[in-house]
Amino acid sequence: MRVIPVACTVLALALLSPSTQAAPQAQAATDAATPESKASDAVARIRQLAVEIERETAPRDVERRKFNELKSLIDAEAIAQFVLGERLSGAPAAQRTAVISALSDLIADGLMERLGGAHAEPFELEGARRIDNGDIVVVSHVRFRDGHRGELDWRLHAKGANQLMVDVLVDGASVAVGARDQAATELSSNGGSIPRLTASMRNRLRFK
């Protein structure tokens, strides 16, 4: 006589739709997503896209789509503000847009070169931590072209619901600081021209 309740329970579970069963799991996954996990996922995605673009043969439009996705994980506007400061704020809108786009392309191109080649194995994520200003630092290691195991410390901050890259330290050297120093040198020699700086950035790109 005890078989009937058990059978009813089994039948009730079987009648649950896949979406009904999946909903609590999806909600749990959403609830479990922390800034640290989002930042780690963003870095992992940058690495994956770099590998796919550098190592796979694909139509140009596919490569461009992946390149644009990689750029979407970089807060180029924030980096450009750090790099150029008041020069960016005082530039005409068209010049601001152009230089931010060029800087975004240049940083993404550098990440592809650093992380995408066959030399860049293994790539290891070592963990994430929040720093005092609320940004997240993600530590990773990868083999560089010269054969040594280098450290990349990624700094990401919240923008909307996402965590976007605002800097990466390569063996302790900041990409953002390097870009700022390079820009300062070029601006001092080109009369302070943002368009000339933009053209110079584009001339240094591998992926065009």
Regions found by a protein language model. Give the residues of each.
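N-terminal signal peptide c-region/cleavage motif recognized by signal peptidases
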Residues: 17-19, 23
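Short beta-strand edge/turn micro-motifs at domain boundaries
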Residues: 149-178
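Early exported N-terminus immediately downstream of N-terminal targeting peptides
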Residues: 24-111
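Solvent-exposed loop/turn segments at secondary-structure junctions
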Residues: 88, 105-106, 130-131, 144, ...
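Surface-exposed, charged secondary-structure patches
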Residues: 101, 109-150, 200, 204-208
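Positively charged n-region of N-terminal signal peptides that target proteins for export
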Residues: 1-4
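Bacterial N-terminal signal peptides
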Residues: 7-16
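Low-complexity, intrinsically disordered terminal/linker segments enriched in charged
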Residues: 170-208
